Design a protein with these regions (language model features):
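Feature for soluble, non-membrane regions of globular proteins
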Residues: 1-174
Length: 174
């Protein structure tokens, strides 16, 4: 990530995730059955609606940020075979990711891999990110990620970040 985000931006974003973890620990202490629960477990739990929503939002946001931090490599990776099969080329895939990310006002752009089939989805409702399956790549398009390095210029951020997406992750099973 330090190829396209400054150390200060990465540290700020890491602190943001740490604060989300602290908030979740407060919810865990007030709802003991949430202690150690995974996202899919929380979906199935009988909880007060606001507890469930808060827990799902925080757990999903933490998980998506952790995925965001590992979705990039130190150098550009060649496209996985699944990318070439689904999109014809790495350039076509990255263009699709770019177009969707540019149109997304906030949230995450998530990439799912289903047995060689690749799907790019917008995610503005954190509770839905892990509902059916786990994404294998995440791109945070909220301004708080890139503002200190790129101002409000999302396009510059995307053009700098996208070449470093670790496309080899698209061959892994979620």
């Amino acid at each position: 990530m330090n190829r396209f985000l400054s150390d200060e931006s990465i540290a700020t974003h890491s602190d943001y995730v740490r604060i989300k973890r602290l908030k979740y620990s407060i919810i865990e202490s007030s709802v003991p059955k949430l202690k150690g629960a995974r996202i899919r477990d929380v979906y199935r739990m009988r909880l007060a609606p606001y507890d469930k929503r808060d827990a799902l939002e925080l757990l999903s946001e933490i998980a998506l940020h952790e995925l965001f931090f590992v979705s990039f490599s130190h150098s550009p990776y060649p496209a996985a075979d699944a990318v070439r099969r689904a999109y014809g080329s790495e350039a076509n895939f990255l263009n699709e990711v770019y177009k969707q990310a540019m149109s997304l006002p906030y949230g995450f752009l998530l990439v799912y891999s289903f047995g060689g089939r690749i799907e790019v989805r917008e995610c503005t409702d954190l509770c839905s990110a892990y509902y059916r399956s786990a994404p294998v790549l995440a791109l945070d398009v909220c301004e708080h990620v890139y503002f200190s390095d790129y101002g409000f210029d999302k396009e510059r951020y995307l053009l700098a970040a996208l070449p470093y997406l670790d496309l080899t992750r698209l061959t892994e099973s979620p």
